[in-house]
A protein has these predicted regions:
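C-terminal motif of bacterial Sec signal peptides marking the signal peptidase cleavage site
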Residues: 19-23
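Bacterial lipoprotein signal-peptidase II cleavage site
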Residues: 24-34
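A ligand-binding cleft/hinge motif common to bilobed small-molecule-binding domains
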Residues: 123-129, 246, 251-271
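Extracellular/periplasmic bilobal clamshell ligand-binding domains
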Residues: 331-373
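Periplasmic-binding protein-like
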Residues: 159-163, 223-228, 234, 268-293
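Short, polar/charged alpha-helical segment
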Residues: 47-61, 67-88
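Mature extracytoplasmic/periplasmic domains
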Residues: 282-283, 287, 291-349
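Extracytoplasmic ligand-binding site segments that recognize negatively charged/polar headgroups
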Residues: 63-78, 90-106, 112-249
Length: 373
């Protein structure tokens, strides 16, 4: 599956980006963005959207980082922004992790190729709030309070729920997490990554915990589940990818619903890939947008936020099978055809706090290797 953040590769990439900038001799930007755009906390503070658009077009450029074109439909989102505003988007290091976004911003501070905006996991956003410029988009009130910083330093943009993707021609449709222990799934169940390092895999173990008597505070039943899955011979220790799915090597994949659902579209006509979000184990998470306080293009950065939180931007996320943060407030403005393709969710939805996630990660670090060794 597509991942954001192979650490070794991305650290090399950030270093390469720094060297490339130095080689090009790009003129340094000021440490603090000049003009009102650098401190504006809303479009109104700049005189309204027309003034913001005018200022952004004058800058003429936007630097983004860690936005793979096939992830949450960012390829189309970037093209739509460029076409709408005639602003060039420079997309650097598309596979960088959230922490590597921050590392790049620190290393490139003062240069006109430094990231203007970030797309971050919550833990990294919380740890780096002092690097962000507070800004509230025009649709601020539509964003649930629990998914945004009260001051506008960062806020959820898109997310999803952990899911089970499966080849309907090779296995029966699972109706619960526990179904994966049945003989029909022998040698067929793959997890997207190492849960001690990858967010998707971590949430996969949390899903297993919820489906086996655990809670947001207790991941141990999830670790025990995967131990049983391994003992039953059902766990397939292969990193899933479109190629392993198409070849039949990984006919069952535990991953985010938007990445699994994207495979349904990609593999249409080749195999019948279906996705289910277990009703008893709905663990969700959102990525977060933030503007760099040192953004070399502060007006374009703010216009980017306005665009992706507009109906147009949110529908582009939806088209990419992710769940835009404003979806519940969009009503009939949401793209119905795209919305209808989302995996169904019925039941209690769980979103971990950072404290709960940190506790779970500590348990995983201490027990995972032994459980599946």
């Amino acid at each position: 599956m597509l991942k954001r953040g192979n650490v070794t590769t991305k650290l090399i990439g950030v270093g390469a980006l720094v060297l490339a900038v130095a080689a090009c001799g790009a003129p340094p930007a000021k440490d603090t963005p000049a003009g009102a755009a650098g401190t504006a906390k809303s479009a109104q503070e700049l005189g309204g959207m027309d003034k913001l658009v005018e200022a952004a077009k004058k800058e003429g450029k936007l630097n983004v980082i860690a936005l793979p074109p096939d992830w949450a439909n960012y390829g189309e989102i970037i093209k739509a922004f460029e076409a709408k505003y005639s602003i060039k988007v420079d997309s650097a290091q598309p596979d960088a992790s959230s922490q590597e976004e921050i590392n790049a911003a620190k290393q490139l501070k003062g240069n006109d190729r430094a990231p203007d905006v970030f797309d971050l996991g919550l833990n990294v956003a919380l740890a780096n709030k002092d690097l962000f410029a507070p800004y509230k988009v025009s649709t601020w009130e539509d964003i649930p309070a629990e998914l945004k910083d009260a001051d506008g330093a960062y806020y959820g943009d898109y997310g999803g729920f952990m899911s089970i993707g499966f080849d309907a021609a090779k296995v029966p449709a699972p109706t619960s997490v526990k179904d994966l222990l049945k003989p029909e799934y022998k040698g067929k169940v793959a997890l997207n990554g190492d849960p001690t390092q990858a967010g998707a895999a971590f949430s996969g173990v949390m899903m297993a915990a919820l489906g086996n008597g655990g809670s947001a505070d207790d991941i141990a039943p999830g670790v025990e589940f995967f131990k049983q899955l391994k003992q039953a011979g059902n766990f397939q220790p292969v990193d899933p990818s479109p190629a392993t799915i198409e070849s039949g090597q990984t006919p069952v994949v535990i991953d985010w619903d938007y990445t699994n659902a994207a495979q349904t579209e990609k593999l249409k006509g080749k195999l019948d890939w279906k996705v289910v979000v277990p009703a008893e184990a709905q663990i969700g998470a959102y990525y977060n947008q933030a503007i760099s306080k040192d953004a070399p293009h502060p007006a374009a950065a703010r216009l980017w936020q306005e665009f992706i939180y507009s109906d147009e931007g949110q529908n582009l996320y939806l088209k990419g099978m992710s769940r835009p943060v404003r979806l519940d407030k969009m009503g009939d403005k949401a793209d119905k055809a795209a919305k209808d393709k989302l995996p169904k969710t019925d039941g209690k939805q769980v979103f971990q706090t950072q404290q709960q996630a940190d506790k779970a990660k500590a348990v995983l670090t201490a027990t995972w290797a032994q459980a599946i060794g």
